[in-house]
């Protein structure tokens, strides 16, 4: 509902902008763009302003052409002031890169307008940044490979225009949930794209669409496009979570859209607790846990620690996060084969797993499978996420949720009773022999088995304990290969014996 209201509001702004096109053109001429080079972590202090063509500013501001140059670009604003995230991001960058030139691109006067008008100004602001970079190259021999543009929302597309207009190739552009309205589906030269820098990484945190509009752009537009929690539904940003703190429905949108900034700040401040994303074709496949591979550069750090991958473009990557900093957690792929030995009438099990590790244990974690339906006599693959590092897995406790007092459970029970007439004889019984696990962050594989093979049965309200029985997974293809070699060897054995016999006869004839 909130998403639809916001989308409708943006669409109405577009209508208003069309009716007031003359005022839009005049405003763009009056707007000012400032390059505020930070000397202090406190944004309340004025800082030092770089101005194209004024060489004395370089010495006054202490600009170091041999160091990294990081430009931070805000987006659309309704308040006309820097939002709190800007203070946090500037502070985090300056603490991580103490020698870097940190410059805040201030285009507040051009961003505090109707949304479509602010969109129309992004090209002009991008060109202004490009002019500044060209001048710095001429005056200081600034290497563009050391330049990193970080843009949030509309600021991401501003960075894209800067990369288009600059003479040369910028080292890196990071897009923090680039704006979606008026950019979704646009030509590459009219938005941020992978051609705008040597390395373009994008974080998508609010891609939920309504009325054909998404606050954050949905399509992949960079070299790598990372979708935390599928790109929407960020933990800690639900209506219940946000309203208890802010009491404003707009804060729900702000929380998810702005989460990209906080994930980036987290990557700067918690470099010893880095978050990993995994290449996958879509959120549904990632939810199955089948994309936790790091082979051939299929995984990457997120945020500031992301690294360029060769010959990659529009690579979609996914991860789950915690609700608060540090946002990083731990991903596990689990494969569980469930047998229905009694051919029960629609047992429809709901499973939970409790993980026991070398450092810690988890509480029960819901086994989330596609369509919320456990496949019987089939292998079920699913993703498990833990917020804490529990160490190497030692034991898994699998529980089948018992029947509850809910109406759905009562109706399901009545249906089973009616069909079977005798519930005691038709009590659903399933078997789970083993669970295979792959840890995404360490890439380690383990197999967990039931200690006593006579006790593999599980029914509603019961649990099974599986212990680690081997490192790695069984390699069935290898066994088939070995059996093939064995068959070929024994089929070839008579020929070898015959050859050996003939050879012995010839040797005996020579000796005589």
Model-derived features with residue positions:
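Glycine-rich nucleophile elbow surrounding the catalytic serine of serine-hydrolase chemistry
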Residues: 150-161
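Alpha/beta-hydrolase fold nucleophile elbow
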Residues: 142-152
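The conserved beta1-alpha1 loop
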Residues: 73-77, 152, 177
